[in-house]
Swiss-Prot record:
Region (Disordered): 19-43
TM helices/strands, residue ranges: none
Biased composition (Pro residues): 29-43
Name of the protein described by the UniProt record: Uncharacterized protein DR_0705
InterPro entries: Aldolase_TIM, GH114_TIM-barrel, Glycoside_hydrolase_SF, TM1410-rel, TM1410_Glycdase
PANTHER family cross-referenced by the UniProt entry: PELA, PTHR35882:SF1
Amino acid sequence: MKPLLCSLLLLSACAGPSEPQASGAGPAQTPPPVTVPMTPPSKKPALSAVQHWGVQLTGYGQTRLNAVHTSPFELVVVDPFDDDGTPWPAAEVRAAAQGRWLIAYLSMGAAESYRSYWQKGWKVGAPAWLLNEDPDWPGNFDVAYWDPAWQAIALAQLDRVIAQGFDGVYMDLIDAYQRHDNRPGARAEMVAWVCKIAAHARAQNPQFVIIPQNAAELIRDPGYAACVDASGNEETYVYAANRPTEAARQRELLASYRLWQQAGKPVFTIEYANQPALMKSAAERARAAGLIPYVGERSLDKLILNQP
């Protein structure tokens, strides 16, 4: 799966052609739409009680995190840096986190050339853990996520997020193990990496929340469930953008989601759509399956408050 965050310097919305929705993929009965309350929550709920969430990874502008602070969402994922690449001060993080879970986005399975850790002269193969550049996402590079050198860099980013006061981390590119078919232990190494991240964070803050994005199937692997608190997933019902997913994909993902739910862990979904009927259908189907949906633009440069 592609990285969730486009380069701050090369941000663009992705789009695709529309196609008819696969037949037989929806529930027999559709529940009424759920309206997001338009007032900020007064008290942070238990993670398992979150019903509305959102994501904004850039486009903060002069109002900074104010849109998050005044939003009705009980959980919001933001980039740990402002639009200028400066880490959010702890005071701003505390203010935005009032009444909600404020979660920091980090790419733990890929390197980004626009991040502060990137060094001049780096290129594919130098350092050794830096692998191919993603042709669809300039500035994003596969990494040997099992390499201790990369892990040290990523954990330093995690330390900064914890120091800023975030409630948890939303980890992108956990499904990167799927790109290493020639490495027999790639899946187990990703599970070990996620659990290492969790142990590192919880040693500093036992309440720190670990939310991997995608790779929901890893819940089947021994030990993984104990390391994570919730699952975040892109494109369950709609590909970016406005392109319904196949019924087979939906069945496969929903089977994994049920295992998360049986383990008592919430499943957050994000769909990239701006056609009202498709937005409504995706959100309703997600809620009927016990999921917590968010529907937004692929650019993720603003919070979409008017959720279906």
